Amino acid sequence: MENRWQVMIVWQVDRMRINTWKRLVKHHMYISRKAKDWFYRHHYESTNPKISSEVHIPLGDAKLVITTYWGLHTGERDWHLGQGVSIEWRKKRYSTQVDPDLADQLIHLHYFDCFSESAIRNTILGRIVSPRCEYQAGHNKVGSLQYLALAALIKPKQIKPPLPSVRKLTEDRWNKPQKTKGHRGSHTMNGH
């Protein structure tokens, strides 16, 4: 019988970012209790030796599983040290992979207080609304003019430490274009 391959999207992430993610998840599970329903699975609880950890986030009758890996093949650059993250949505026997933005939106729908679009309608109806959004990573678009006006009145409260964002975990901070301050290009290229 032939070998069968299963392809999975694994976001290449540096080790320090994964460690920060794990610390934030554990802090909000055990200390702040904002993520008390989440489940953290250690590497020694997994049968796969490449799995570093798993975070199971219940979403109603489904769940989001964020798996961190170690010991993968290194990437093209020196800092790609064989660490990675996969994000999976599971419901009963069905599972699919999701991108970090969608993962943050799914987390935001089920956890953390939010001052959202529905706040405008609820405010007009005289209902009490949450004064601010605790999980800004869950919003990926610019709100309506009314939403922006109401949000401008209420400054977001900085939560220390911040809530764990999947988008922030998988963000590629190495390949972004560098920003130089003050100078308009190279001195040698400008002829100065």
From Swiss-Prot:
The keyword Calcium does not apply. It is a peripheral membrane protein. Residues 14-17, 74-79 are annotated as: Interaction with host APOBEC3F. Pfam families: Vif. Residues 171-172 are annotated as: Membrane association. The modification Phosphothreonine is found at T96, T188. Zn(2+) binds at H108, C114, C133, H139. Induction: Expressed late during infection in a Rev-dependent manner. Changing Q146A: 90% loss of interaction with CUL5. Does not affect interaction with host ELOC. Transmembrane segments: none annotated. The infectious clone pNL4-3 is a chimeric provirus that consists of DNA from HIV isolates NY5 (5' half) and BRU (3' half). Homomultimer; in vitro and presumably in vivo. Interacts with viral RNA and Pr55Gag precursor; these interactions mediate Vif incorporation into the virion. Interacts with the viral reverse transcriptase. Forms cullin-5-RING E3 ubiquitin-protein ligase complex (ECS complex) by interacting with host CUL5, RBX2, elongin BC complex (ELOB and ELOC) and CBFB/CBF-beta. Within the ECS complex, Vif interacts directly with host CUL5, ELOC and APOBEC (APOBEC3F and APOBEC3G) substrates. This is Virion infectivity factor. The lineage of its organism: Viruses, Riboviria, Pararnavirae, Artverviricota, Revtraviricetes.
